């Protein structure tokens, strides 16, 4: 089934349904389509027969379009979903049926305004990641995908770029439901050897891959752009069909033609880096002066660039007609890639590795990429709040990040300097020492108080992209501990937000919290995330607690993983019931059985004990 919405407005929309019917030649076949609105109410129905003159065994049938008055449009804020029900009868008997969800929305791309959804300008504020889900690895669980999306959305993200393969069918369907825009990607390089793990050469089966991919995903309203490849214009062997010698342009045009055969409603792109035109890279002496975008970027319908956001204005001077999307941005430069962009004219940004993932670790004992804003457990680092200050400017924000100089990293990765400024919220340090920290804010100014004493007031420097919304406080006196409070104020001096961190005392208890205690389905696949935090007598997290935690569980669930959030540990996630806590925390992931029942979780650590009782529910 292929569902399109050729005309969309707040007052009226048309919905067109196309189906493929096989094995109909000797029968009187009728096809009926019924549309239901998000509440399940029938809002339209149409019937059609088969074409009279064709010898095709599998025939595409376009049913007459239906017009809906006052449609409920799909958007990030209100992801309204309709259902299209198709029933096929042969000689009066029902022989097949199919139901598909879809959304009513319009997409527009332009070099003048970037991207519009339903006629409204939207700047994509995205994440580009590999598809693993923390301790679960590449296993697909709906709850884990939804949890990740909701956490990103709560920090102002509205888009995810799939990298560098189609994600699960569940991923896009959950994005439909949650209201996350998706840039759907086919593959990495167009190579028969490198970056391709298939049993057959990529250039032999590309047509099958594209057809299967587009047909599977084309009804998803969350998907706004097809990405056909990534960082391939640097070697001819990565850029498609041998002998074309045009850095992928011919291959792209062929791929794009097949994409349009199966979906004419979306544009296509290819993410470009690290070469300029002619495959000139940083290793060539003319690189810094030769600001000509790669040939393929000038041929794609949307020009996607990874990194080098400071060169985009020069690219647009060379080719003003480019519709420009920053498909990867370095997290190490924080908000600079975001503020380097002309947000009125460009499509958006996707930070590479906003969430920690496995692989590309650079060094032992690290297991993956951790130059990120979110831990692989989805716990936010302080830098995530900096991103939130820009992604959600309407919400006053201030957040403290204490500098951990020993944890800082910086490496050259694929011609990009990447790394991380290690920050935390711990205020347990050596008496008499000094600590530097940042306050991240979108307010006019911040006052810092240490144990009630003012360290001064600093204004937010909004004139420089590399300093905006981040205020540095050097050598703040720790004394004997206590509290640090950041107070954010507007231009009039009125307090608009504050954040407080405190020195924790001795560990006395375990705080055990289930994330969705009343929503745990007994379907054999639903997950329950349980977060364990070691606290002192005042309920403050004890950051320097690293004792082992032991778990006992019984009831209608099974233990999937123990995850302390440490990206450097060599401890297992699975098949264990005890693990060292990290920064006083542990995440427990449980999976329901198929029968409803009670679940009891008993936890102990160095004399601290706690019990959590839950129930799974059969729908």
Model feature map: region roles:
Residues 1-164, 174, 178-182, 219, ...:
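Secreted/periplasmic carbohydrate-active enzymes, especially glycoside hydrolases
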Residues 149-152, 159-407, 411-415, 426:
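Substrate-binding/catalytic cleft of secreted carbohydrate-active enzymes
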